[in-house]
Amino acid sequence: MLTRRRFIQLIATLFGSAFATACARALAVPTAADPTAIPSRTATASPTATATVTSTATSTPTATPVPPSPTPTFTPTPRPTDFVSVRGDQFYYRGARFPINGFNYYPRLHPWRTFNFGEWEPAVTEQELKLGASLGANTVRMFVDFNASLTGTLTNTLPDAVGVIPNRQYLASIAEFIEIAARQNLKVQFTLFDGMDWSFYAPEKFYLVQTYLYTIIPMFANDARLMCWDLQNEPDRAIRTVGANIVIPFFQRVSNVIRQLDPRQLQTIGWIDRARTQYFPDLDKYLDFWCFHFYDQAANLPDLVKLYKSKTTKPVLLQEYGLATGGPGPDGANTEQDQAAHYDSVLKTLDENKMCGSVFWCLNDFPVGLAGNPPLQTDHPENHFGVFRLDYSEKPVARVLRSYWKPSS
């Protein structure tokens, strides 16, 4: 079990004495792990809904360290208006409405391994984020692989409390990414726990998750260059595997820990299955806005938008959508013109319904043998979702995005 003293020693070794001192100050005040203890900071009303899941949360082991003070690490103290905020069902930034114009990002040659040891290439990322910004984007979504953040590789691990402290080099690469994004005026959606083993959802393992969060969140807390904490990508799979009675309380606890460490920053989760709206009542007071992913025919989007808007008064962001322009099978049997028409239809639907924005999948095409976790060794539609081809030339869909996003010259 990780004791208070051992936690401070580890932090001092890995991150230096100043950060360890901040941890020691915070460890003097214990806090509750009750998943219902901290309400969301948005003031929107929850709609009436049914089919809620019964929370079966159990208490968290008491030996878990209390989080360090959320002191900003990389930037001066920002003004409140420097953060993206929520009013009603829209986002605001510096006093004005801020429609999310975003893209999901993996490097062209290192998909699913952005920050892995030996694969992080900041100059390439700068070049690629410039391409996204040239479309009129104001937001980029990136992914922190849970295993890679500990070991530098995608190797699946089941660590103890010592082993769940994120690697210093990996965190430095994330910090560099945020700096690069800021130079392109891109807010960052910071997606946590990608690729995490199912066993970590169990209540008895939550002290490990807390230890992880107590290290990674303070490094980027109070940083207005972030748009939000995305608690996990598509946890629908976890619900199917370990059950909603485990997964929903897990995210309630995660939200509370992050809210304590970084109270200003927005929080969300991206769902792919429309059935997950049944859990909105259980998470509505924890999350500041909702996200959904859409890979269906564009003609089916209007009904889905109406469904989501009927379930919450908070912003509902289309966080993934796209169309592959190659690869075997029916999912790859689309032309680049089909892709452009699909985007046009999707963006038109969002505008007509006064939605808060969208984040397309994805910026670049990928070479065969790299995309996926584990990588797909033969050609697949996953390699062909990009708005930019392998040589960085634009597909016709780029013109569609610019027509809606209207980038400044």
What positions do the PLM features span?
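Hydrophobic, well-ordered secondary-structure elements that form the walls
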Residues: S358
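Active-site mouth of glycoside hydrolases
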Residues: F83-H293, A298-A299, K311, T325, ...
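Aromatic-rich peripheral "rim/lid" segments of glycoside hydrolase catalytic domains that contact
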Residues: W361-S409
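Ser/Thr-rich, Proline-interspersed low-complexity disordered segments
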Residues: T21, R25-T81
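N-terminal export signals
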Residues: R6-A26
